[in-house]
A protein has these predicted regions:
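Alpha-helical, coiled-coil/dimerization segments enriched in small aliphatic residues
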Residues: 251-279
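Extracytoplasmic ligand-binding site segments that recognize negatively charged/polar headgroups
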Residues: 108, 164-170, 184-198, 231-261
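Secretory targeting signatures
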Residues: 1-31, 48, 54, 61
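Alpha-helical segments with a strong preference for the paired helices of cellulosomal dockerin domains
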Residues: 33-73, 147-152, 169-178, 311, ...
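Structured C-terminal subdomain patch of bacterial secreted/periplasmic proteins
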Residues: 188-201, 210, 214, 221, ...
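Short helix-initiation/N-cap motifs at beta->coil->alpha
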Residues: 83-85, 135-148, 276-285
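A short, structured surface patch at a secondary-structure boundary
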Residues: 96-153, 157-168, 268
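Bacterial Sec-exported substrate-binding components of ABC uptake systems
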Residues: 65-105, 207-241, 366-401
Length: 401
């Protein structure tokens, strides 16, 4: 760093040391952003000088990053903790992003910052048409992308999943250290909202993130509050089915899996909440019948906005109702076996799916909810495409439209 760079950094440091400490929540206002930038920059200047002059060995900005951070202050540096718990700090705007996870791109209107997308994002181009103009890096979800295609993008950041796809041994180890790797899912209801606020702050699109969060809270908070008021003795016992596991075994969701959250947020009681050690596990149909569920909520890994073919969801429904031992449960007797597409149940559109589930469970209590209208509002406001959810897409079985 040149002498003028040191002088600028020291001048900033002196000013920052007498400023009040910033709050720990995700910054949303200009003042909060500037306050956090001040705290981070002061910390990094001290760490750099400790390493440079006192033999310190702690992590710190490089000379180039410290110069950029000082130059871009007070809008930068920006710091978040991603969903893996890793601290992410940037010192300049991110403008060349590979979106291996692209759930956030269109709703936050960040298409221009994206250079490459996973093939799964390209397949969803019916509601994300920008994806057709980007480099297809392959992969998506659990499938690995093409590393050469990622190099072709020359990214300054990769935004990927926590629970799906390659780990750091792929994205971090194979990329230059200058490439920021951020891991967020935008899937789990328990932390999707916070992830949107964090990525909005990191990419300087706080207003768009706040707009989505306000829309999300409008529906989710209302459903959860109304469901919480249902007396315990009136709550439906629900078995969550996430597919066959061979023979008479079914795979189910326990506490910590997003379908469990949907079930409980809608007022249901997950009969397998404490039965399996992991987020998902296997139980026998005889055990399911013994729980005598009032409803069965199935998750099908098909459907969504990009197809009009309901066959996979219908087959999943038939697979459950065809289990002879389950025909004696209240769920089967009262026609309360429901299937929801995972492309509807997870992701930023999930408030519409939650409304669907709540209305399935308690049609009288949630008679005023219109899940189809919520889904259409999501498409209109956050994707801005000509797409009629009443005519296209496969979201549930039986089809509630």
């Amino acid at each position: 760093m040149k002498a003028t760079g040191y002088a600028a950094a020291l001048a900033i440091l002196l000013a920052l040391l007498i400023a009040p400490a910033a709050a720990t929540a995700v910054p949303t206002t200009p003042q909060e952003i500037h306050d956090v930038a001040g705290d981070v920059l002061a910390e990094e200047i001290i760490s750099f000088m400790d390493a440079e002059y006192c033999g310190g060995r702690g992590d710190h900005f490089s000379r180039a990053d410290l110069a950029d951070a000082s130059h871009n202050f007070p809008e930068y540096p920006r710091r978040i903790t991603d969903t893996t718990g890793k601290e992410i700090t940037i010192v300049r705007p991110l403008n060349r992003i590979v979106a291996y996870n692209s759930h956030w791109v269109t709703p936050l209107h960040q298409e221009d910052k994206v250079i490459g997308v996973a093939n799964s994002g390209v397949r969803a181009a019916v509601i994300n048409p920008y994806a057709l103009e980007k480099i297809d890096i392959g992969g998506g979800g659990p499938n690995f992308p093409d590393i050469e295609k990622i190099y072709e993008c020359n990214p300054d950041a990769i935004i990927t999943y926590v629970t799906l796809g390659p780990g750091d041994d792929f994205f971090v180890d194979k990329m230059p250290s200058s490439v920021t790797v951020v891991r967020m899912d935008y899937l789990e209801p328990s932390y999707l909202r916070d992830e949107i606020l964090k990525i909005g702050y990191l990419l300087d699109c706080q207003e768009q993130a706040a707009e989505y969060v306000a829309w999300h809270d409008r529906y989710v908070d209302d459903i959860k509050q109304r469901a919480a008021a249902i007396p315990e003795d009136e709550r439906l016992k629900v078995f969550i089915d996430v597919g066959a596991s061979g023979g008479a075994d079914r795979r189910t969701a326990s506490e910590g899996q997003y379908m469990h959250a949907h079930c409980t947020d809608a007022g249901g009681v997950n009969v397998a909440a404490d039965t399996v050690a992991a987020k998902t596990g296997v139980v026998n149909t005889e055990w399911i019948a013994q729980q005598n569920p009032d409803a069965i909520l199935g998750l099908c890994y098909a459907g969504g906005y990009e197809t009009d073919d309901p066959t996979a969801l219908a087959d999943h429904h038939s697979d459950i109702t065809g289990q002879q031992i389950l025909t004696f449960t209240p769920a089967a007797k009262n026609n309360q076996v429901y299937i929801v597409s995972y492309r509807y149940a997870y992701g930023l559109q999930y408030p519409a799916a939650l409304a669907t589930i709540a209305k399935w469970f308690y049609p009288d209590r949630f008679a005023d909810l219109d899940p189809e209208a919520i889904n259409q509002e999501y498409i209109d406001r956050f994707h801005g495409v000509d797409y009629d959810v009443a005519e296209h897409g496969v979201f549930t079985y039986p089809d509630t439209r």
